[in-house]
Amino acid sequence: MNKKLIEVALPLDAINDASAYDKMPGIGPHPKGIHQWWARLPLPCARAVLFASLVDDPSSDPAFADKTEKEQEQERDRLFRIIRNLSQKKATQSPEVFDAAHAEILRSCGGKLPKVLDPFCGGGSIPLEAQQIGRAHV
């Protein structure tokens, strides 16, 4: 079974910055941030985690089996750029970002979109972003 990108590495700095902005857009630390709804998952975080959960890491991707470690690292960096783009503050205004993510998910999943399940569905972030990044079945 192939390892997914989330099992190997993530660009946490970009995800954390975008998630902090999503919690308090434009105002920075503010008293309204004292209490957040417990199930509220920031949308940039949901996008990044879903993408990394659906995409194969280059180290276990059959297309990269004969590649050097450096080439695999370059491919991982390319996937990280997609995650950073998905995590941007205004990512929803850039359809090409979601097109790139969708294409990568299809490539990793053999051309067939996976079903994404969220049995707890707290604030609805995961189903919403699953549809947006990969147009996956929820």
List each language-model region with its residue ranges.
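Short charge-dense sequence patches
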Residues: 1-2, 100
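N-terminal-proximal low-complexity accessory segments that begin disordered
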Residues: 2-41, 45-48, 58
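Short secondary-structure transition/capping motifs
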Residues: 35-39, 68, 115
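Class I S-adenosyl-L-methionine-dependent methyltransferase module
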Residues: 39, 58-59, 132-137
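Active-site nucleophile-adjacent alpha helix/oxyanion-hole segment immediately C-terminal to the catalytic cysteine
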Residues: 49-53
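Short, glycine/acidic-rich hinge or "gate" loops at secondary-structure transitions
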Residues: 59-70
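Conserved S-adenosyl-L-methionine
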Residues: 72-74, 78, 88-137
